[in-house]
Swiss-Prot record:
Keyword set, alphabetical order: Disulfide bond, Ion channel impairing toxin, Neurotoxin, Secreted, Signal, Toxin
Tissues expressed in: Expressed by the venom duct.
Protein name: Conotoxin Rg9.1
Stated family: Belongs to the conotoxin P superfamily.
């Protein structure tokens, strides 16, 4: 099958566009809410604090109870998870 140069260029551009939608935006790159101008970075927790990490669960819900020391409350799941940072916060 013989494609013209223009068809090849269009096909390459479409592939780059399709791959760009999946690869181009990483989870930590979106930092500002376009509608409200809120800095979303301050609302996000690092991806390394995943509940899939062994031992990350602190063992309690945090909807009405404060999390234990070195744990944080996940805002959507309402569960306490262990801090995974190497440096402690003040």
């Amino acid at each position: 099958m013989h494609l013209s140069l223009a068809r090849s260029a269009v096909l390459i551009l479409l592939l780059l566009f399709a791959l760009g939608n999946f690869v181009g935006v990483q989870p930590g790159q979106i930092t500002r809410d376009a509608d409200h101008g809120i800095n979303l970075r301050s609302l996000r927790k690092q991806m390394s604090r995943s509940p899939l990490v062994k031992g990350a669960f602190c063992g309690q819900a945090c909807s009405s109870v404060k999390c234990p020391k070195k744990c944080f409350c996940h805002p959507e799941e309402k569960v306490c998870y262990r801090e995974m940072r190497t440096k402690e916060r003040d």
